[in-house]
Amino acid sequence: MPALKVGNKAPDFTLPDETGNLVKLSSLKGKKVILYFYPKDDTPGCTTQACGFRDEYPSIEEAGALVLGISPDGAKSHTKFKTKQKLPFSLLSDEDHKVAEKYGAWGEKSMYGKKYMGILRSHFVIDEAGKLVDVQIGVSPKDSVRLATDAVRVA
């Protein structure tokens, strides 16, 4: 699958949130969405990214947008993480990483000299028409929050 670029239509998906409710991206048309992929609940970088979006959430809402976090973790892990960090947005479970693959957010990583496949920290800002207005793959947690928040304000 070719890499997603600004101007492309965001691939549709349906995933369960932390309560088991299904979230379908296309049902959010008419709203701006910050969709971010992160490797694992309650780990340092992922907590930094999630809490960054939490702290910016009032200005994100003011811009007419919402945030959806996606990782391979299940509902129980998401519920615990969301509660612990007081996150005001939904966390979606992509346990088979099919949605991450669609978005190019699944790829080869390396830790301590070992290569493995995993989530590449990424975000995608989607406008009201369902088009991508910002695409960042392999972004740092702090840069992700800043860049996505800036993009959603001008989208």
Regions found by a protein language model. Give the residues of each.
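Chalcogenol-based redox active-site neighborhoods
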Residues: 1-155
